[in-house]
């Protein structure tokens, strides 16, 4: 199990330290890595077990020497990523590790490095940490509260007791380093911890030194500081305190933070105006202007009296000497309070309101309902402000805003960040631009940009993959540990002063506290103490006063240096921003040139395309003209075709009417033919009847002649009767034959007439057929011509559709007419057949009845009439229509089929 292997590795490390003296943490680091691979996130149960094991090890192992404490610190640094801490664990570790190590004056720097790594892991975390949230926030609050309390107490002791300052320098350096880098990531939490300490006057300078360094590092959340009330306390400090060094720190803090909170000043803007009024009314001889009561605010009067009162080894005479020193140096420090930067930033942020306030402060205060607590001279204020105003350029707000709109318009700050605000202030200060980049010692500041960049490694905001155990183990094991730069060093005064001055400058450059530079003063004192062992108490007190005075000078210089570094940092950031903008402008310019060349190329292409478009436009216009011409031609042709169609329709209607008239004539002719055929049949029947009768008569005559020859001697009476009958029969037969001949002649004439008319009608029908065929040929030729023209015109496809549609419509109409005609023709033929059948039946009936009527009178006259009657009945059973009639009907049908 990874947990058991980890516990075993912990015990092995301590066992190796007891036996050999030089433990190896490689095995422990490997076990920690394997445990993290097995449990990527913190396990609460395993974390509790590991904490119990660590408590058991701490209770069983006597950590009574520095080596074991260093080992214990290294072990904690290795296993802390596996733990889930709470307030109780932080309190136990503070009593076991943090406070003893931080309070030890002889501690090694690698120990402080590992200690800071553990503190950074506890303090700085992601909000979305695996075991973050309220639990880790409580641990961070408990730790930072204890660190702030320890730092404040050590700083007050360090400023008050100059004898033991060097022993606390390393501790204060570590505390300041932790607090500064915690404040960079969590400025709101740090300023909240400083609020209740800031009410105590001796703590204000140490607290402001840390906060000024935090703001100088330009963290990401500096705008959260006014939300805690610490900003209000600093404004009160600038309004009521009288210590020049404290006011210089407060002024530096205000100047540095204003660029981050310029959009949320509100009522504090009027307080800033009053602070400027107070600073401008400072007189080097009389001091600060008189003011009203400060309420419950405890005023910090001066540096010497405040921190001299914290020591108990000074006498009244020494305090009077110190007071004399303070009084003699007070004007110099008052003159060093430069408020021109405050004028520049207030003029850059709210120029209209600021100048209106300077014109008449009382009127402006009554207008905006706030109180000015200081007495001031309007002429002196105008004189000093005119000199500062002459160094600045005209602001653009004078053209854009009024006094009211300048206060209410917050949108103008959304386009500016803190670097842009500082750049705006510097751009308006035409005279102070060159002066602000110079070093206070007369030279230029270093040109490296590494100091102004954000902290890296553990000092930076930890990322998700941050692992404190993966850092190199920084513990060294010297045989004879010692502290460099101690009071017993054998260096000379000049070398010590030079080296410690350089060390102080380097340490200040990296953001340490004011106590780092004091080591040079103590080095001087150590050198003098080693050379002069018989100093009196009076000389020692005067030396302490001198050291405190030099310490105050050093604090002034440190504050000025921090502010100059801040200005330099802002300049460098602005230069970097301008350089980036310049690079961007160059890129934009190159892109613009490229776009111009591309634009020119595109213009040439556009001109070429325009010429081609004009050419195509002219061609399309010509094609359009041709199309219009073709459309007109086709429209004219279509109109002509429509006219022809109308003529064809009229001709068709005329032909239909003529056909109908011909059909009616044909019907009448057919009827007459039927009648003629019927009469012909009747005549033929009569002729046959007469022929039979004639034959009978001839037979009868032959019989009579024979009978005459045989019976020659018949009586006269019978002979007379027979002769009378034969004469009657002959007379009747002759009359009948004459009448039949006349009827035959008339019927033959009528038949010839009908045949001639039939031939004439057939000729007319043939002519009509030929005309129709000729018309169809002409129409088809025209249609073929139109189709050929339409197919040849490929550039005018829009004409095909209407012509094709018209052609299809005409064809559909013609096919429909033909179908209707075929239907009518079939119906006509059916009706004609039915009519002929009915006519045949009628003729049959007539033929059957007429012989009966004609022969009824001759039945009783002679026996031969019975035979003729039988013949007539047999003839009636023959086909109804004779050959002439069948021929006429066939010809009429053939003519209709051809039509």
Curated annotation (Swiss-Prot):
Alphabetized UniProt keyword annotations = Coiled coil, Cytoplasm
> Which domain of life does the UniProt lineage start with?
Eukaryota
According to its record, what are the GO cellular component terms?
cytoplasm; TSC1-TSC2 complex
MF annotations from Gene Ontology = GTPase activator activity
UniProt keyword annotation of Transcription regulation present: no
Function according to Swiss-Prot or TrEMBL: Together with tsc2, required for uptake of various amino acids from the environment and for proper conjugation. Involved in induction of gene expression of permeases and genes required for meiosis upon nitrogen starvation. May act as a GTPase-activating protein (GAP) for the small GTPase rhb1.
Q: Tell me the classification of the organism that encodes this protein.
A: Eukaryota, Fungi, Dikarya, Ascomycota, Taphrinomycotina
Predominantly, its location class is: cytoplasm
UniProt feature, compositional bias: Polar residues: 889-899
Recorded source organism is Schizosaccharomyces pombe (strain 972 / ATCC 24843)
- What gene is this protein a product of? tsc1
Coiled-coil residue spans? 540-706, 737-847
- Where does this one sit in the cell? Cytoplasm
UniProt name for this protein: Tuberous sclerosis 1 protein homolog
Annotated region (Disordered), positions in chain? 874-899
Q: Does the keyword Coiled coil apply?
A: yes
Q: How does it assemble?
A: Interacts with tsc2.
**Single GO BP term:** positive regulation of L-methionine import across plasma membrane
Q: Which is an annotated Pfam family here?
A: Hamartin
